[in-house]
Amino acid sequence: MQHESPIKRRPSTRIYVGDVPIGDGAPIAVQSMTNTRTTDVAATVAQIKSLEKVGADIVRVSVPTMEAAEAFKLIKQQVSVPLVADIHFDYRIALKVAEYGVDCLRINPGNIGNEARIRSVVDCARDKGIPIRIGVNGGSLEKDLQLKYGEPTPEALVESAMRHVDILDRLNFDQFKVSVKASDVFLAVDSYRLLAKKIDQPLHLGITEAGGARAGSVKSAVGLGMLLAEGIGDTLRISLAADPVEEIKVGFDILKSLRIRSRGINFIACPSCSRQEFDVIGTVNALEQRLEDVLTPMDVSIIGCVVNGPGEAEVSHLGLAGSNKKSAFYEDGVRQKERFDNDDLVAQLEAKIRAKAARLDEKNRIDIKHVEQD
């Protein structure tokens, strides 16, 4: 049941993207990016709202043209989640979306232009209280760094980042975060490790262009898991060639696995074998779909037999241990008198889980109230 994470977070400064705190011990923010055409306002708004529904803290939107900037204005008016404008090549687009209430500007050092252009963006951001993300990517390094290093290396990515960190420092602008993304896990991990030793600004994590839903999730979990376990990272995005909603789900699953940020149900379920007394896979899949709206952090174990079932149930908020015809049910580690019919588990478990979530929410509300009074 909800053990505390042993991970000690890297100290960092604090910025805000809209009303979302980033860095300095704030919860690690999970974000995604729209893949609609930004000029299709209705489709983009719909996708942003679907991301917000599954818990996205921040959403990034590509703004490649002035026409897209005008569409961004309309999009911003229709959503409540903080929006980051993704800017490449034309710094003037950053100035335009700043007028329309953007919550953060992402600029790419590899293509945004010279220091004078960066100064224009920084001056505008300062005037309007907008933070910036320096977003370095292994696939779009500056040409001189490509020539110097021959290929993307941790040193090349970090040198690119530090050039722009130094510019922002000279301009006395400290409201920024940094990312050094690469599609190779070790390149990304080593780049972030090196950067973390050089600056104390918040770091945005990601394995860029990670791949499809399955392979990309695994690659991201490995790479980001390594960094997060070392305390590195203040916000993250899982980059998948898939529905952006999956990026949010995977991001929270990674944080949940490391006990860094728990949101929703942590299902402990066996892969099933011939000893299973009920359909474990079907039961878990059905419960995951039915209970996506439950945000209460809790552990629920669904084990198909008595080999590991009781042991897992004893350390879960709720647990089911498969047995012949009727399965044993546990709450807070204690076996209950009632047993569940193996042919009708999903509805019974859903009701129990929702009731438990409500009780935990009420307990948490009371605990918070007592802390505030003290």
Swiss-Prot record:
It is an enzyme of class 1 (oxidoreductase). One of its GO terms (molecular function) is 4-hydroxy-3-methylbut-2-enyl-diphosphate synthase activity (flavodoxin). Pfam families: GcpE. Pathway: Isoprenoid biosynthesis; isopentenyl diphosphate biosynthesis via DXP pathway; isopentenyl diphosphate from 1-deoxy-D-xylulose 5-phosphate: step 5/6. One of its GO terms (biological process) is terpenoid biosynthetic process. It catalyses: (2E)-4-hydroxy-3-methylbut-2-enyl diphosphate + oxidized [flavodoxin] + H2O + 2 H(+) = 2-C-methyl-D-erythritol 2,4-cyclic diphosphate + reduced [flavodoxin]. Its cofactor is [4Fe-4S] cluster. Keywords: 4Fe-4S, Iron, Iron-sulfur, Isoprene biosynthesis, Metal-binding, Oxidoreductase. Its EC number is 1.17.7.3. Signal peptide: none annotated. Binds 1 [4Fe-4S] cluster. SUPFAM superfamilies: Dihydropteroate synthetase-like, Nitrite and sulphite reductase 4Fe-4S domain-like. [4Fe-4S] cluster binds at residues 270, 273, 305, 312. Converts 2C-methyl-D-erythritol 2,4-cyclodiphosphate (ME-2,4cPP) into 1-hydroxy-2-methyl-2-(E)-butenyl 4-diphosphate. HAMAP family: IspG (MF_00159). Belongs to the IspG family. This is 4-hydroxy-3-methylbut-2-en-1-yl diphosphate synthase (flavodoxin).
